[in-house]
Amino acid sequence: MESAADRLARAAAQGRVHDVRALLEAGVSPNAPNSFGRTPIQVMMMGNVHVAALLLNYGADSNCEDPTTFSRPVHDAAREGFLDTLVVLHGSGARLDVRDAWGRLPLDLAQERGHQDIVRYLRSAGCSLCSAGWSLCTAGNVAQTDGHSFSSSTPRALELRGQSQEQS
């Protein structure tokens, strides 16, 4: 027999708002992991902002981390281009400054996929590419962040910039 946590995760993954609401109202925890160890907010249909809002209103952890990839729901929303869901997650306390297992921020993922609306939102929320340190930055990221394009002189400029920041 399928557990309540599995039913809630499946309903969230399929974007079935009515079923998600019914299960939450019946007392199923929005943070209970399914049989694969994932919570409903981790497996929800990212494009259904109503499911996200409902789970969050019932106390889902907007910062839950995937134990394998270290990604969080904001990484998924940014990568897949779901601005409305990202806004709801952020409004519920989701951190935008966390990196996944490959060192990528949600902003990096949105930039890689060309989701400029998400890039604009994340920048307006105070995010910047490579905000956690130079070791994980690419030269192109830093050049773009500063409003420049990448050129053959960029690596030397980055080296000098990094040295001046270390001395500060």
From Swiss-Prot:
Q: What is the effect of changing P73L?
A: In some liver tumors
UniProt PTM comment: Phosphorylation seems to increase interaction with CDK4.
Region (Disordered) location:
148-168
Quaternary assembly: Heterodimer with CDK4 or CDK6. Predominamt P16 complexes contained CDK6. Interacts with CDK4 (both 'T-172'-phosphorylated and non-phosphorylated forms); the interaction inhibits cyclin D-CDK4 kinase activity. Interacts with ISCO2.
The stretches annotated as ANK repeats are: 3-32, 36-64, 69-98, 102-131
Localization per record: Cytoplasm; Nucleus
Tell me the SMART domains matching this sequence: ANK (SM00248)
**Could you provide one GO biological process annotation from this protein's UniProt record?**
replicative senescence
What does this gene product do? Acts as a negative regulator of the proliferation of normal cells by interacting strongly with CDK4 and CDK6. This inhibits their ability to interact with cyclins D and to phosphorylate the retinoblastoma protein.
The name under which this protein is listed is Cyclin-dependent kinase inhibitor 2A
For this chain, the family text in UniProt reads: Belongs to the CDKN2 cyclin-dependent kinase inhibitor family.
Where, per the database record, does this protein carry Phosphoserine? S152, S164
Swiss-Prot/TrEMBL keywords? ANK repeat, Cell cycle, Cytoplasm, Nucleus, Phosphoprotein, Repeat, Tumor suppressor
Q: What is the effect of changing V74M?
A: In plasmacytoma cell lines
Name the gene behind this protein: Cdkn2a
Q: Which Gene Ontology cellular-component terms appear in the entry?
A: cytoplasm; nucleolus; senescence-associated heterochromatin focus
